[in-house]
Amino acid sequence: MTPETNNDETLSRPKPRAALPPVPEGMSKSQWKKQWKKEQFELNKPLYAKIRKEKKQKAREQRRERLQKALEENGGEIPEELRRTPRVNVNQKDSGIKVIIDCAFDELMNEKEIVSLSTQITRAYSANKRENHFADVKVTSFNKRLKERFDCGLKGANYDAWKHFEFTDESALPTTNAVYLTADTDETLETLEPGTTYIVGGIVDKNRHKALCYNKAKELGIPTRRLPIGEYIKLCGRKVLTTTHVIQIMLRYFDNHDWKEAFESVLPARKLAELADHAQESNSSSPAEEQDAQDI
């Protein structure tokens, strides 16, 4: 496929998606649509890789230009916002908590969602080695397509050597000194306790499977809690946090044991609608606010 080019940005562009071909005999329209989209995705993989490479190159060039301009304007000093974050924080402290990313939902995700989950896990690892505090993280039910993604699609990741990160195909979850984090519970997580294991659902499903992690935790007898987001901030857009966000928020909490500060420092500015008045929301909350908190 020959990439189209934008003359202004000189970046490759994928061609508009073609119309869905006639449905083959013996297949439903939804089955054919899913298969055809997958085929188109595979067909365009080389082009998407080229687009990502061009965007990274353009971003590097723009950063060099900003850096050069800043150096000229600041007498040779690099502004704080342009300084790179060290890949590893050598002054890290042990948070004392353990985190499990429960990935036992492979069959409930499509290929793109598996890729998205693998990206979230790698970003969670990056956060775990850069933040001021780290946790011992274990990825359970690491098998099937997710493992294949790491072994084949992320060659060179060397994930089996990641520090404070363990991958296992075992699916068993602890039921003592453990908490399953899910937005579908009414119980709020007040604080993070060293010695406790916090379980995060490793699933990207665009909210198709309601109360999935909550029901699993209940079946296993594991207490459930939700992050106290609604008590401190309000979000705009989809009230969904990635696995990366959840882990990073927990690590940031240990900086000052301040949930509000942790949320504001981690969540993208585009998701922050306005800061909530914690004092008012502690005394009263409307049904809409309660629903928002459960949707997060």
UniProtKB/Swiss-Prot annotation:
InterPro entries listed in its UniProt record: MT_TRM10-typ, MT_TRM10-typ_sf, TRM10/TRM10A, tRNA_m1G_MeTrfase_euk, tRNA_MeTrfase_TRMD/TRM10
Biological processes, Gene Ontology terms: tRNA N1-guanine methylation
GO cellular component: cytoplasm; nucleus
EC number: 2.1.1.221
Gene3D superfamilies linked: 3.40.1280.30
Positions contributing to S-adenosyl-L-methionine binding: L181, T182, G201, D205, K206, N207, R208, H209, C213, L227, K239, V240, L241
Localization, UniProt: Cytoplasm; Nucleus
Regions that span the bilayer: none
Superkingdom as given in the UniProt entry: Eukaryota
Signal peptide as annotated in the record: none
Residue ranges of the region described as Disordered: 1-33, 277-296
Function: S-adenosyl-L-methionine-dependent guanine N(1)-methyltransferase that catalyzes the formation of N(1)-methylguanine at position 9 (m1G9) in cytoplasmic tRNA.
Cited PANTHER family: TRNA (GUANINE-9-) METHYLTRANSFERASE, TRNA METHYLTRANSFERASE 10 HOMOLOG A
Protein name, entry field: tRNA (guanine(9)-N1)-methyltransferase
Source organism per UniProt: Eremothecium gossypii (strain ATCC 10895 / CBS 109.51 / FGSC 9923 / NRRL Y-1056) (Yeast)
Taxonomic lineage of the native organism: Eukaryota, Fungi, Dikarya, Ascomycota, Saccharomycotina
Gene, per the UniProt record: TRM10
